[in-house]
UniProtKB/Swiss-Prot annotation:
Chief site of localization: cytoplasm
Localisation per UniProt entry: Cytoplasm
Pfam families linked to this entry: RNA_pol_N
Enzyme class: transferase
Source organism of the structure: Halorubrum lacusprofundi (strain ATCC 49239 / DSM 5036 / JCM 8891 / ACAM 34)
Metal-binding listed as a keyword: yes
Name of the protein: DNA-directed RNA polymerase subunit Rpo10
Amino acid sequence: MMIPVRCFTCGNVVGEHWEEFKERAREGDEDPGKVLDELGVDRHCCRRMMVSHRDLVDVVSPYQ
């Protein structure tokens, strides 16, 4: 669905970095690891939240 506001494991705020990460790493040609380093997302649990997230709102919305 939508990116969670906080990391499930440590509670650190990750939602504020999602838009920039999506623009630079997913739609651009930059390395996701370098983008996360520049954004200050350094914990492996928070990085997992950003890298593994898939936006499924458009897929699920027709069924509601």
